Regions:
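Conserved PLP-enzyme active-site core in the AAT-like
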Residues: 1-193
Length: 193
């Protein structure tokens, strides 16, 4: 949507580095209405329009204040894009928060997308680290593009260990963070109605 992190906060990287043309739809606090992205999907349009190859969704929505996307809405978009051969990517940097807030399994979110990115530092407390998930073929291609962009790292075992620790020991504590955030928001609302 128009407030998506990949559009607002990445300095136009998709266009600058990859020549990608992006289109976006309006939303209320980032909440997904399946009609939004589907109104922009174009396939089989000949040589005069750009065909849609990817729909990107964000969960939770950063600039929407942490809006959690309903799994039903995500499934509806997937059911519409899949027959058209349009891939889906989840910017799931904060997916852990959606999982904890809704009880929806991480795998239930993941199975709706061709690729998913998650961040190990946002919410989980790892010092750094993001992970891209997808099929073996897509990950092989992603490794090639990572190398082309000069994004490889060496000696990352210590960072991987921190990420594994965060997954094993911090995910279940996110509900405590949610409770503290709700108390803080309530106190702010009471202090400044």
């Amino acid at each position: 949507d128009q407030q998506a992190h990949v559009l607002r906060a990445e300095l136009g990287a998709a266009a600058a580095f990859s020549g990608i043309t992006s289109r976006s739809w309006p939303s209320e606090r980032g909440l997904l209405d399946p009609a939004g992205p589907m109104s922009l999907v174009t396939t089989g349009v000949g040589p005069y329009q750009v065909e849609t190859s990817l729909v990107v969704l964000e969960n939770t929505h950063n600039f929407g204040g942490g809006t959690v996307q309903p799994i039903e809405a995500i499934r509806e978009v997937r059911a519409s894009t899949q027959p058209l051969g349009v891939a889906m990517h989840l910017d799931g940097a904060r997916l852990w928060n959606a999982h904890v807030a809704t009880g929806v399994a991480l795998s239930a979110y993941g199975e709706q997308f061709d690729t998913v990115s998650v961040c190990l530092s946002k919410g989980l407390g790892a010092p750094v680290g993001s992970v891209l998930l997808g099929s073996a073929d897509r990950m092989a291609e992603a490794r090639i593009w990572r190398k082309r962009y000069g994004a490889g790292m060496r000696q990352v075992g210590i960072l991987a260990a921190a990420g594994i620790h965060a997954l094993d020991h911090h995910l279940h504590r996110l509900s405590d963070d949610h409770a503290r955030a709700a108390r803080f928001a309530a106190a702010c609302a009471e202090a400044a109605p």
